[in-house]
């Protein structure tokens, strides 16, 4: 019997392949071939290294705003978790918060696993998906309607004690914003702007309404007649509401996946995780430290704070770090090899969502191309 991933890949092959390779040469042609093979409707890709000019390629459509360009903004989905972690670690480095303090010490509501009431939950656990929370139906039903998070949490506890097991949780990651707001008495949006985006000179926001440039839609390539899951034009028209007001009970739907930036911003953010500067060397090391394995989800992956830690020889001989994003049909990736000084970013409006061992096929192919190649991207 065919499994869902095999069926998906068969359906994908039935779609017409975009002609992105036409006019391309060298590695740019190989990148274009991967984007075509995975039916990317629109994409911006960058490969970079410490000792070479970056290789950048933009193809296809961003949806209602027209062709993808270097300046196109994308909702980067779960890469937001890595971006949020950068800011959290800088705040910890500056002594403004603690990674290992009980979050109940600052939150206006209690977060404690009922089966393990004596085990405190910390920011380190929230950043590493070891907090005991799971994305139960109550989370999916509540996050879109902004139900207070304290009303959702009781129905979202898993079976494992906090700090003992990995369970990918958007609710847990989203709670990071609530903790920061309660600790600093500022909105999450302003915390990220003041302590991360402005410091790095990055144009980014967690609210589409704050993006002045062209913002890509996001939609699924299968079925090909589907509507945009993320209609950028419609999202921009919504009122920003309490974006500048701390609301720990209601701002749990931001940090896990709502960050919006362009390729220039994404490269600056990835490089901030790749080398000391924004963070000092000890904090960089703490961010990359593997805290827990993905278990049955992937034999090659472990979790750091806001980072995947990937040891898969078929992709790269070195350990890779970064994060994947997948929402509304858009597939994104941001990964780096600190030993070789190389990195890659993928931003799309729509692409294949097929996955192997948690990583998407399109990210896997681009990572193999970027991190297994030697010398210049232009040879």
Predicted feature descriptions by range:
Residues 292, 314, 351-379:
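Short, gly/Ser/Thr-rich active-site loops of penicillin-recognizing serine hydrolases
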């Amino acid at each position: 019997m065919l499994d869902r991933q095999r069926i998906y890949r068969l359906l994908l092959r039935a779609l017409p392949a975009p002609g992105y390779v036409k006019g391309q040469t060298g590695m740019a042609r190989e990148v274009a071939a991967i984007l075509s093979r995975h039916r990317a409707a629109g994409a911006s890709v960058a490969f970079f290294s410490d000792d070479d000019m970056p290789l950048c390629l933009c193809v296809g459509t961003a949806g209602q705003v027209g062709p993808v360009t270097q300046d196109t903004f994308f909702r980067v989905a779960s890469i937001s978790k890595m971006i949020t972690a950068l800011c959290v670690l800088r705040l910890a480095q500056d002594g403004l918060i603690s990674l290992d303090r009980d979050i109940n010490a600052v939150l206006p509501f209690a977060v404690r696993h009922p089966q393990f009431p004596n085990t405190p939950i910390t920011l380190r656990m929230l950043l590493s998906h070891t907090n005991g929370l799971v994305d139960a139906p109550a989370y999916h039903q509540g996050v879109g309607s902004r139900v207070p998070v304290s009303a959702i949490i009781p129905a979202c506890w898993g079976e494992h004690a906090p700090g003992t097991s990995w369970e990918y949780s958007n609710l847990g990651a989203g709670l990071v914003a609530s903790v920061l707001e309660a600790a600093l008495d500022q909105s999450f949006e302003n915390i990220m702007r003041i302590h991360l985006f402005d410091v790095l000179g990055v144009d980014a926001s967690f609210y589409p309404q704050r993006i002045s440039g062209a913002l890509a839609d996001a939609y699924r390539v299968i079925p090909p007649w589907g509507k945009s899951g993320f209609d950028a034009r419609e999202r921009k028209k919504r009122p920003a509401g309490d974006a500048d007001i701390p609301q720990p009970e209601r701002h749990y739907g931001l940090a896990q996946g709502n960050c919006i930036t362009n390729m220039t911003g994404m490269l600056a953010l990835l490089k901030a995780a790749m080398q000391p500067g924004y963070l000092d060397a000890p904090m960089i090391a703490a961010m990359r430290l593997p805290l827990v394995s993905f278990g049955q989800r992937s034999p090659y992956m472990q979790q750091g704070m806001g980072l995947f830690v990937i040891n898969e020889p078929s992709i790269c001989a070195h350990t890779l770090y970064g994060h994947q994003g997948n929402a509304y049909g858009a597939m994104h990736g941001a990964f780096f090899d600190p030993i070789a000084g190389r990195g890659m970013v993928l931003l799309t409006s729509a692409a294949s969502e097929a996955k192997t061992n948690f990583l998407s096929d399109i990210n896997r192919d681009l990572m193999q191309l970027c991190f297994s190649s030697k010398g210049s991207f232009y040879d």
